Each structure stands twice: as structure tokens, then as C-alpha cells.
């Protein structure tokens, strides 16, 4: 890898997704109990895409991110990143994958940077550890810090940086070896709303400038609303996807989101909880095909003859 020549953005291919998860399961064993974190999850992400994963605590979103990062192996299914199946990689292959294919940003800033190194030293360290030339590593570090807006803070240690600045350094560290995939687990979770928006702006800018694929786990609806595609996970499966749209009326631009329920490969459909509560659907429901539509009714709904 030539760090003096940054990777050019790759054109997105609708026929060959960069990330493919099929029927993905992850089961954790805790003493005599088994906890199923992912339950047959299916997901496709295009190369160069910027997307968010949302969901309640325990829904499986951080587990999915750890699997994509090569930090945790799924129990069953397929997980392909760039055409390579993470389930069949050797331990040595996974180390190489984590070093060069993926960058990771944690929520806790203390996990992202070393406190006794300056910002530029933190960024150049992964390059040097991977056998890169120190001179090239230093130039690359300065370039990345400039891209995240910290060119004037490069010689400062993390304890003298604000929380937002520390996360910007963390993003630069994650991109040091020019990975095509950047994963961020609640990167703005410990920041105020204004700083969180600024940090997300950095992620969006890097996605556009470098062509890096970015997957962000977030609880922040304000951040999620700025992303073109948001995937919601519930009970270890993808439940809904929403897409950000922009329309023009000749004078102004309007931003809105189209939300879709996801039907998996076995035909399972997760209906949003608020919908179930509104129509009082609990354990069972009636399905009826009416004029090209499928109606979902409470089990005690009156039965009408179908035409």
C-alpha cells in the first residue's frame, strides 16, 4: 500500500455489495445460558455507502459491528466483506483484516488514543506498527489531521483536547492505514449535540472525499436523520430501513424519510411495536389479500369473504 497515493473512491456496484450478511447468527454462552444476539440477520451494504444502524440496547447492533470488524466471529451464517468470508478466515488472516481492511472508532475516547502520545504520534503509530516508513507515516498523519480539522492541534496530547477533538483524532487513527471500511460504535455518545453534529460532519466529509464505506451505530436521532440510509435492528434481525429523500418544489428543498419494513429471505416481517399497539395485535394476527395488498388484522377481527 502506497500511503503517498490515497485510495481513489471506488464506484458503487449495485450487483456486488461490499458487505453481505446472510442468515447471520451470534450466540453467547453465559454459564448455563445461551444468549442469541443475532437471529438470522440479513444485510447488504454498497461500497462507498454511509449508513447508520439504530436499535434499542441489546438489539444486536454492537454485536453486528464487532462481527464486521473481525473482533467477534458469528456462530453461523455468512459474513462477506469485499468478497471474503470472515467465518473462514484464519487467526492470521483476521489480524491482517483488522489492520488493513477496517478502521474502528469506539464510543469511549480512552479506547481510541494513547494518552501519552500527541495527536500526530497517535495517528502515525498504526502505520509504523504495520511496517510503514516513519517519514511516510508522519506525512500521512498530518494529512489526516488536516482532513479532520486538527492541523493546528497535531502536537497536543489527548488530555488537552476536547471530547470532540479526541474523537476526531480517533477517526484519523482509524483511517491511518487507508482502510476501505470505517466502523464507528456510538462515536458521538459522550458528546453534546453541537459537537456530535460536527464530528458526524467529519465522517460524512471523509466518506465523500475518500470513498470509504462508513457504518455508524448510534442512538442519536438527530445524527440518524442526516444519513441517507438507516437500518433498524430489533431482536437480532433487521426490522426496518429508511431512506433520506430530497424533493424540490421549484423554490425550496424538502428532506423526508421513506421507511420500509424488511421482509427477510424466509418471509418474516417485523411490524413496528407502535403499530401493533395501535391495532391491538398481540400473539396472532389475520392476514388477508385484498386488491394486491396484504392486510394485517387483529386475530378477533371479523372475517369477510375475499373476492
Q: What do the PLM-derived regions correspond to, one by one?
A:
Residues 77-85:
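Conserved ABC transporter NBD signature motif
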Residues 115-125:
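Short coil-to-helix segment of the ABC ATPase nucleotide-binding domain corresponding to the Q-loop/switch region
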Residues 69:
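Helix-to-loop junction immediately C-terminal to a conserved catalytic motif
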Residues 84-85, 124, 135-153:
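Conserved ABC ATPase "signature" region
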Residues 157-161, 165:
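Conserved ABC ATPase signature
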Amino acid at each position: 500500500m502506497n500511503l503517498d497515493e490515497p485510495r481513489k473512491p471506488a464506484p458503487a456496484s449495485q450487483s456486488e455489495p461490499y458487505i453481505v450478511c446472510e442468515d447471520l447468527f451470534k450466540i453467547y454462552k453465559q454459564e448455563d445460558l445461551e444468549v442469541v444476539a443475532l437471529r438470522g440477520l440479513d444485510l447488504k451494504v454498497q461500497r462507498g455507502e454511509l449508513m447508520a444502524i439504530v436499535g434499542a440496547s441489546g438489539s444486536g447492533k454492537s454485536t453486528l459491528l464487532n462481527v464486521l470488524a473481525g473482533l467477534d466471529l458469528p456462530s453461523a451464517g455468512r459474513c462477506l466483506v469485499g468478497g471474503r468470508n470472515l467465518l473462514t478466515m484464519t487467526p492470521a488472516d483476521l489480524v491482517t483484516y483488522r489492520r488493513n481492511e477496517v478502521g474502528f472508532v469506539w464510543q469511549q475516547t480512552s479506547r481510541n488514543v494513547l494518552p501519552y502520545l500527541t495527536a500526530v504520534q497517535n495517528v502515525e503509530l498504526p502505520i509504523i506498527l504495520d511496517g510503514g516508513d516513519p517519514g511516510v507515516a508522519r506525512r500521512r498523519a498530518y494529512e489526516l489531521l488536516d482532513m479532520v480539522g486538527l492541523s493546528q492541534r497535531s502536537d497536543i496530547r489527548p488530555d488537552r483536547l476536547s471530547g470532540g477533538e479526541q474523537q476526531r483524532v480517533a477517526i484519523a487513527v482509524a483511517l491511518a492505514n487507508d482502510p476501505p471500511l470505517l466502523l464507528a460504535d456510538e462515536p458521538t455518545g459522550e458528546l453534546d449535540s453541537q459537537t456530535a453534529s460536527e464530528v458526524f460532519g467529519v465522517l460524512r466529509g471523509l466518506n465523500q472525499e475518500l470513498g470509504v464505506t462508513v457504518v455508524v451505530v448510534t442512538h442519536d436521532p438527530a445524527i440518524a436523520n442526516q444519513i441517507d440510509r438507516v437500518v433498524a435492528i430489533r431482536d437480532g434481525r433487521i426490522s426496518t430501513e429508511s431512506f433520506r429523500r430530497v424533493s424540490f418544489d421549484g423554490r425550496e428543498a424538502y428532506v423526508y424519510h421513506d421507511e420500509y419494513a424488511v421482509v427477510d429471505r424466509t418471509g418474516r416481517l417485523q411490524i413496528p411495536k407502535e403499530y401493533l399497539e395501535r391495532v391491538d395485535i398481540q400473539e396472532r394476527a389475520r392476514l388477508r389479500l385484498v386488491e394486491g395488498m396484504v392486510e394485517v388484522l387483529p386475530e378477533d377481527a371479523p372475517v369477510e369473504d375475499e373476492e
